[in-house]
Swiss-Prot record:
FMN binds at residues 62-66, 86, 139, 172, 217, 245, 268, 297, 318-319. Monomer. The active site is at residue 175. The gene is pyrD. Its EC number is 1.3.5.2. It comes from Escherichia coli (strain SMS-3-5 / SECEC). This is Dihydroorotate dehydrogenase (quinone). It is found in: Cell membrane. GO terms for biological process: 'de novo' pyrimidine nucleobase biosynthetic process; 'de novo' UMP biosynthetic process.
Length: 336
């Protein structure tokens, strides 16, 4: 497969520049006959989850296609689902560059992107143009300059605008790169947010005559007690699914490596065990009451199977996809 050569060239570039260059090429082919260049035939392995039928259990995690610019090209590679975003009500530039770093030896990434995106209206226009036949998740967050106390309003604005176009909606309250965001995972703040989101979901269901499930994305850095509280809140509010996990602030597995001290969330292989352990504990706590989408360091069939054995119904990749390329999709879907 050609990807090792492509990767070698891309890894000569700054990580964000490599991402921009790749997306420039994907934008050129998305929705055109040239999509055949990236198309892969993968077996159908349907999974029912959150009331939806996924054509296979492997999805693309949020963060790669923030604005939904390359949905069709990414879909052609064989993903059973694609989660676009995180998107916010208003466009925002994100944090200062550089803000994305490779830990090549660990096959990890550190990012402090800060929800850079072109805003929800732009994303909706891109979704309208897409022809992807898998499940499209849309991941939403709050603008950096929205006070945390008013954060729920940003989620409700996004929900209203994307509801008609989303297969499911992911609520991102676990990015470490938006000040105060992770506080929404706890206690009263979480209950308040989930109440508002569930009420909005009910209103939108009545308006659009369709039910769009809601999944909440959580951090891997929760204590045992916090995890129990989160699980309890999700069940009490009838949330449809949980995505576990986002990136970690823990650096214990990458000490001494180049870029290890950069601020931001660590993803990729160093997150693998930590996220699997959260999934296992969450699964025990939830006891089948809502499904788990497992994400964090999946870079092989074995890693994907470990997430499913720990209790995940579906899995997603991001960093592994950067390091291994499209062949990883085919390998996981074929052998999982």
């Amino acid at each position: 497969m050609y990807y090792p050569f492509v990767r070698k060239a891309l890894f000569q570039l700054d990580p964000e520049r490599a991402h921009e260059f790749t997306f420039q090429q994907l934008r050129r082919i998305t929705g055109t006959p040239f999509e055949a260049l990236v198309r892969q035939k993968v077996p159908a392995k349907p999974v029912n989850c959150m009331g939806l039928t996924f054509k296979n259990p492997l999805g693309l995690a949020a963060g790669l296609d923030k604005d939904g610019e390359c949905i069709d090209a990414l879909g052609a590679m064989g993903f059973g689902s694609i989660e676009i975003g995180t998107v916010t009500p208003r466009p925002q530039p994100g944090n200062d560059k550089p803000r994305l770093f490779r830990l090549v030896d660990a096959e990890g990434l550190i990012n402090r992107m800060g929800f850079n995106n072109l805003g929800v209206d732009n994303l909706v226009e891109n979704v309208k143009k897409a022809h992807y036949d898998g499940v499209l998740g849309i991941n939403i967050g709050k603008n950096k300059d929205t006070p945390v106390e008013q954060g729920k309003d940003d989620y409700l604005i996004c929900m209203e605008k994307i509801y008609a176009y989303a297969g499911y909606i992911a609520i991102n309250i676990s990015s470490p790169n938006t000040p105060g965001l992770r506080t929404l995972q706890y206690g009263e703040a979480l209950d308040d947010l989930l109440t508002a989101i569930k009420n909005k979901q009910n209103d939108l269901q009545a308006m659009h005559h369709k039910y769009v499930p809601i999944a909440v994305k959580i951090a891997p850095d929760l204590s045992e007690e916090e995890l129990i509280q989160v699980a309890d809140s999700l069940v009490r509010h009838n949330i449809d699914g949980v995505i576990a996990t986002n990136t970690t602030l823990d650096r214990s597995l990458v000490q001494g490596m180049k870029n290890c001290d950069q601020t931001g969330g660590l993803s990729g292989r160093p997150l693998q065990l930590k996220s699997t352990e959260i999934i296992r504990r969450l699964s025990q706590e939830l006891n089948g009451r809502l499904p788990i989408i497992g994400v964090g360091g999946i870079d092989s069939v074995i890693a994907a199977r470990e997430k499913i054995a720990a209790g995940a119904s579906l899995v997603q990749i991001y960093s592994g996809f950067i390091f291994k390329g499209p062949p990883l999709i085919k390998e996981i879907v074929t052998h999982i």
